[in-house]
């Protein structure tokens, strides 16, 4: 890990400074966090996990088992990382199931933010690092966090292959292991939507703490009034959802929650007819999905001049200025 990250890592339990002791980071209260393959693992074992990756990582660390990628450096040369081949539909959306294990390139999306100019960027729930890499290639200095040690090693491998300068930490979004006000920008995509609303709000509070005053926060969330979202809710009987199910929010509820946690917030359309649709990936997807993506992009662009369309977008962005 680089010197900036080391200086700004704190105990996720009590936010105290950490000391290096052999292969651990230790705070004054003797909370210990292993460093595996130069990746800090900052998870809390006494907290109820909100994703099976937390349990899996804690078990691997307890058994002193590192993912194979930590030992062999991941995929060789230009080969697509095996973890990414397997995980892509779970990180990018249902449209990607037909190309699972068939990727010919990494689906790196367009980050809808201005150039980074070296700003410190936090990618919350990075998994294999597609948005972390996108941020690095746009001039940010990004740190990605995820509860999966396997995902983080894959992310590090992808970064190396893409020539992107990135850093990664294994952490729980509800207990961020960073000093107050150390990031200029925070970002999250297809992550908080799968948290209970209580856990999502806890995560937003931690993001607000970690981002500088007047820093920017851009987070994707699902809109319960989108056509595809309504269909998915009907399929499950309009239940609230459990475990890592998607929780659907109304635009009004989102604006209220984000304004309370950050301050000034605006809502814009991300995509229509589903979650996670990315025009940059149209060459990777089957022909039958291309009309969906083109239609989504048309409506997204139209929503700039017709803001009411945001109310029926399936996926929205909340862009906030941190005043907390």
Mark where each language-model region is.
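Conserved class I S-adenosyl-L-methionine
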Residues: 43-127, 130, 134, 218-240
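A conserved beta-strand element that flanks and buttresses the S-adenosyl-L-methionine
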Residues: 187
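Conserved SAM/SAH-binding beta-strand->alpha-helix loop
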Residues: 148-150
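A C-terminal cap/extension of S-adenosyl-L-methionine-dependent methyltransferases
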Residues: 3-6, 234-236, 269-324
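Acceptor-substrate binding/catalytic loop of class I
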Residues: 235-253
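A short glycine-rich, Lys/Arg-flanked "PGG" loop and its adjoining helix->strand segment in the class I
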Residues: 201-213
């Amino acid at each position: 890990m680089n010197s900036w990250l080391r200086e700004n890592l704190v105990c996720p339990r009590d936010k105290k400074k950490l000391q290096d002791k052999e292969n651990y980071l230790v705070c004054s209260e003797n909370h210990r966090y292993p460093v595996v393959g130069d990746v800090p693992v900052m998870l809390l074992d006494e907290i109820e996990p909100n994703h099976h990756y937390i349990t899996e990582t804690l078990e691997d660390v307890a058994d002193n088992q590192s993912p194979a990628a930590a030992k062999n450096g991941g995929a060789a040369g230009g080969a697509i990382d095996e973890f990414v081949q397997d995980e892509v539909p779970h990180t990018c959306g249902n449209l990607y199931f037909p190309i699972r294990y068939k990727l010919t390139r990494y689906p790196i999306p367009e980050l809808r933010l201005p150039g980074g100019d070296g700003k410190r960027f936090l990618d919350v729930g990075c998994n294999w690092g597609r948005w972390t890499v996108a941020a690095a290639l746009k001039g940010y200095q990004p740190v990605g966090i995820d509860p999966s040690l396997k995902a983080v090693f894959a992310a590090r491998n992808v970064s190396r292959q893409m020539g992107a300068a990135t850093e990664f930490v294994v952490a729980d979004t509800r207990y961020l292991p960073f000093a107050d006000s150390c990031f200029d920008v925070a970002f999250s995509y297809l992550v908080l939507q799968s948290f209970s609303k209580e856990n999502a709000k806890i995560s937003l509070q931690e993001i607000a703490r970690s981002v500088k005053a007047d820093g920017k926060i851009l987070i994707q969330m699902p809109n319960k009034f989108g056509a595809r979202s309504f269909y998915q809710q009907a399929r499950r009987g309009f239940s609230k959802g459990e475990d890592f199910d998607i929780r659907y929010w109304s635009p009004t509820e989102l604006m209220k929650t984000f304004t309370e946690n950050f301050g000034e917030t605006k809502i814009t359309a991300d995509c229509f007819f589903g979650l996670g649709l990315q025009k940059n990936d149209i060459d990777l997807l089957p022909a039958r999905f291309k009309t969906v993506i083109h239609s989504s992009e048309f409506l997204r662009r139209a929503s700039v001049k017709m803001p009411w369309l945001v109310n029926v977008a399936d996926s929205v962005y909340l862009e906030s200025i941190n005043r907390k």
